[in-house]
Amino acid sequence: MFRDKVVVITGGAGGIGKCIAEEFRKEGAAVCVIDCAEGDHYVGDIGDKTTLEAFAGQVIKTYGRVDVLVNNAPPMMKGINDCTWEDFTHALNVGVTAAFYLTKLFLPVLAQGASIINISSSRDRMSQPQTESYTAAKGGIAALTHALAVSLAGKARVNSISPGWIDTDYTVYHGPDATQQPAGRVGNPLDIANMVLFLCSDRAGFITGENICIDGGMTRQMIYHADHGWTLNE
């Protein structure tokens, strides 16, 4: 399905991004990854404008086109108490501005029928304390998605995915953290990667501008103290 397609993934060296990259490679795609972690990919900070320009230039020089762009790299998570101006600005640069700018840089070489996937978060609609930088960035990329979908109508389809709690190399959930999910378990990177590949396929040709929440039903679960076994421990 994706044989010889050119796929660009930010934050593709670990976690969800790594799984997405692996699944596209299994389908025969040429996958271009940028990540701040060291490895056999383009190493750089996507919060930096010149880095994005250099990376995009390399992809365009090598392949001449882009079929799929997955804006996956996560911003830092800091709250109102500790987050500085610089921290917050960098989080928005990584989480929102980079997605906008890479789309702009690749616009002249987007293949007909191209697909752009933005990885948001269930935090684009709900919050925990002290998560302002991350939550603002995820809310921003969710809104950017439908704006781009309209602007790029006829050129590319643009959708976003909002994962809930996902077991990755960095975080593994156990016990009540897992069983509280209506789906009965925590998500895994393949849950997200499968949706990415579906949305980028011809089977999703009538889907654009959408945000799909993959969170095991957590954001649909009404939680109040003393209701259906839920308890608040102050």
PLM segments and residue spans:
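Canonical Rossmann dinucleotide-binding motif of NAD(H)/NADP(H)-dependent dehydrogenases/reductases
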Residues: 2-31
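C-terminal helical subdomain
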Residues: 160-161, 175-207, 214-216
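Active-site helix of classical SDR
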Residues: 103, 137, 145
